[in-house]
Amino acid sequence: MQANGFSFGFYDEPNNLNGQDVGADSLPSVAIESDSLGHMLKYIPEKLSYARVSGLGHTFVQRELWDVKMQLMEQDDSIESDDKLKVLDGCNDLVPNVYEGGYKTWECSLDLANEIKKIDVVKNNLTTVLELGCGSAIPILSCFQEFYKHRIPCTLVFQDFNVDVLRYVTLPNLLLNWYFCTQEHDSSEKHGTIDVSPSLLQEFSDDLARTNIYCEFLCGCWSEEMQLLIQRTYGDHYFSLVLASETIYSLPSLENFLYMLLKNTKNLALVAGKDLYFGVGGSILEFNSRLQKLVDDPNSLKAIKTSTQNVGRSIVYWEKEFPPSNIDSSPQSPLPGSL
């Protein structure tokens, strides 16, 4: 049975949620899996169409959603693919326990990406990064841009509920932003297409390997099983920086999100969200209140306002150990292993 979906009304009707409760009484039955960069590259098509992202203080490109739709139409005519296309057509921002909004770029992810540029991930040695519910991955890829520019070894872990989001949006965005870091291009061009040859993919993979930029992709819901998957490779409290945006809208999933945040943060966590999600119960205030009860030092939390227009937006800082005590001239090495 197809799950009922709904659409957030933040753009046309800022003070109204058009739909229904996104909460679920139980965890969705989706596979929890990890994948490597090398294996994921097979999902990259021969051409990628992109658009520059507005609203950022730095250059960033992302894959066009119509390009994702074209790829899905060409490779699969199943009912499952039809459901994916309905999501891409904009009928539903969310389908509870099926699709969690990862194809779209949300305003709070732009706020978070801009904030990342202020904290200087290189200087502060925040070189092990996890983004929970990454979607288009603009925040973590803004970190990638800094690490790549300075040739800094790092570990980047991209987590999303949907494996298709990782395959068709997250990874292409990583490739595109690497490409624009390495190739001369017209900075005024807002849209374009790049040819993706096997040699380009090999160059991409080899270049990240030479720089010791290690990437891993995790799909599935926030849960003990997901944490065990992370723990087997990294252990607990491994990530110097944990990022998330638009992940606190659903009260039923908030407990699991907090669990993942607490288990994985070593130094600093940044969580961006709307001050209130009308109709679904989530809010920055509720998130901050619950987190205060769980951290050792409530004074390690602070919230900054990023917008007061329409539905207000904020970013919560959890400075667990920040600046890190291990800051020195040598960046933290990523985990050993192949890309």
UniProtKB/Swiss-Prot annotation:
Any one GO CC term of this protein is: nucleus
Positions carrying Phosphoserine: 333, 338
Which top EC class applies here?
transferase
Superkingdom is Eukaryota
Q: What is its EC number?
A: 2.1.1.85
Which BP terms does GO give this entry?
Answer: cytosolic large ribosomal subunit assembly; methylation; regulation of translation
Determine if Transferase is one of this entry's keywords. yes
Compartmental location: Cytoplasm; Nucleus
Q: Does the keyword Phosphoprotein apply?
A: yes
List the Gene Ontology MF annotations in alphabetical order. protein-L-histidine N-tele-methyltransferase activity
**What is catalysed by this protein?**
L-histidyl-[protein] + S-adenosyl-L-methionine = N(tele)-methyl-L-histidyl-[protein] + S-adenosyl-L-homocysteine + H(+)
Record key words, sorted: Cytoplasm, Methyltransferase, Nucleus, Phosphoprotein, S-adenosyl-L-methionine, Transferase
- SUPFAM superfamilies named among the record's database cross-references: S-adenosyl-L-methionine-dependent methyltransferases
Q: Say what the protein does.
A: Protein-histidine N-methyltransferase that mediates methylation of target protein on His residues.
Please give the family membership noted in the entry: Belongs to the methyltransferase superfamily. METTL18 family.
Q: What is this protein called?
A: Histidine protein methyltransferase 1
What is the native source organism of this protein?
Answer: Schizosaccharomyces pombe (strain 972 / ATCC 24843) (Fission yeast)
